[in-house]
Amino acid sequence: MAATKHILRYLKETTGYGLLFPVSLNEFEDCLEAWSDSDWCGDKVGRKRTYEYFFKYLKAPISWCSKKQTVVALSSCEAEYIAAAETTCQCVWLEYVLDDLKLDHVKSMQLCVDNQSAINLAKNPISHGRSKHIETKL
C-alpha cells in the first residue's frame, strides 16, 4: 500500500512533464534509433545474461527494456548477438506502431551494438560455422 501511495504522489507531482517530439528538419534525423547491450555473466547461478535495449524517435526516448535472456549464451559475442536480434524484433514492431499511428517517418533504423564480434557475425553469418546453434536457440 505504501508503494501505491508513493507512485500516486509521484504521478500527481509530475503531471506537467512529458516527452518532447521535435519537428524533423532532416530526413536522416527522422529515423528510429536503437541501442542494445548485454551484460557479462550477471547471473552466476542460472548463467542467463541480462540484455537491455533503448529506442529514440526524433531524438526523444520512446521505449526501453531490461530482461533476462531466455537462453544461456556460450560467449559474450553470442549474448550481444541475441540482444541485437531481440532489439531488431522490437524495432520492427515499433515501425508497425508508427505506421498504425499514421506518423510520417522514413523507414530507416540505426541499431548500435558495442561488440565488434557480434557486429561481424551479423554482417556475415554464413562464414561463421560455429554460430549455427544460435539459430536454434532463438
Short names for language-model regions:
Residues 1-138:
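Divalent metal-binding acidic/histidine catalytic loops
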